[in-house]
Amino acid sequence: MFYCREEELRTMNNRYKKGHFECVVIYGRRRVGKTALINEFCKGKPTVYFSALNASSQENLEALSKAIYTCQNPDSTSTPTYRSYEDALEAITGMAMEKRLVFVIDEYPYLAKAEKSISSRLQHIIDHSWQDSRIYLILCGSSMSFMEYQVLGYESPLYGRRTAQFKIQALTYREITEFHPELKAADQALLYGVTGGIPHYINKLDVESNLDEALLDNLFSTSSYLFEEPENLLKQELREPAIYNSVISAIAAGASRSNEISTKVGVESGICAKYLKVLLDLGILKKETPITEKPGKKTIYAIDDNFFRFWYRFVPRNMSVISAGRMRLIYEQAVKRFYPDYMGLVFEKMCQEYLLRYAKDLPILLSNVGQWWGTDYKTRREVQIDIVGAPVDGNEYLIGSCKYRNEKIGIEELELLRRYAAVFRQNGIFRYYIFSKGGFTQALLEAEMQGEVTLLTLEDLYR
């Protein structure tokens, strides 16, 4: 099934209908659905689909030759290899003389690593042959830093040749409801908290009717695909997976600043910074800075990928029980009772997405939404605000609190927000929002009726 990429597909098809040369760059982290989008687009269209190998230049030339010959002669059993990449690309030129042709190079970073001159060769043939052709070239890759700097960047030979680019992101918490619309809001939220909106993981989790059963069968089981996914992905992408595993484990255990992480891992801070950068490029980690402030001493690292965060939170500590096949016996006590705590950060992200993408009739035109933290110099205590919505212009801010627990939230939460808002901006104008899974007390509901605060439940986020 193909889900939730209708806008990208519509844009790609509109460009295809124009009939002239296109160079479309598609990139994003692994498992996010890039190949599924390309496959959907290519249906019913003459296509040479070449998926580059993490192998030598010659092996890639052989694979490219096979892709070209298979498109030309679907029933042929022999696939001769072109003498050079120039010959292979010229064959593409010849095929496009007769018809509109889609030419896909998937895993382009692998090809560029094996054949250093491929970007220059593509630049030359685009400029001298393909610019006036009917070729629809798609370059796709999972290494975001490579695609951004070596394909889209100013110093790339391909700079200025692209006609469109798509950075494919994980699906939002609302978009994933298309996979299992029968699930209630709490299970939809947990599904998002486990998979992070990655279609591949949602499919592998294979939820039928019960999410707990799906997790036990398809994640907390040594025979399941998802059980080994983080380690397999690190091995596939990185030369030193053990050290990267230690870095992620340190952050999962609570280390957030670079010096804390390097100390836990046991490597020098400069070396640790290189590992952190690679994990940032892969989309596994993220850097966070208090909203409205510039990166600096307050910058912290966090696990951005929900699936990695879930896995590192619950799998390593229960590895012996999982290996013994006894996870079902302790699931309630070892995993499920910690979901409210785990889902706290997930719920914050959902509330941020709601405000930026889905909320209607907001009192402020927002430019950005994020967290804020700092020191209350009166009490000398650290203050953290779950949600701060920064305005496009002016001094009016949205200040919010997110609570993912079953208890009702009371009026004291609004009072706390008011105190925190004064620490954030002394002369600001504030609109208060409180998000709660468990609802609100009567006193807080009355405060909403007086226009003092806007209250939203988990179910409201899906309406």
Language-model region placement:
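Phosphate-binding site recognition
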Residues: M1-R328, E332
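A cross-kingdom feature that marks ATP-driven nucleic-acid transaction machinery
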Residues: I291, Y301-R463
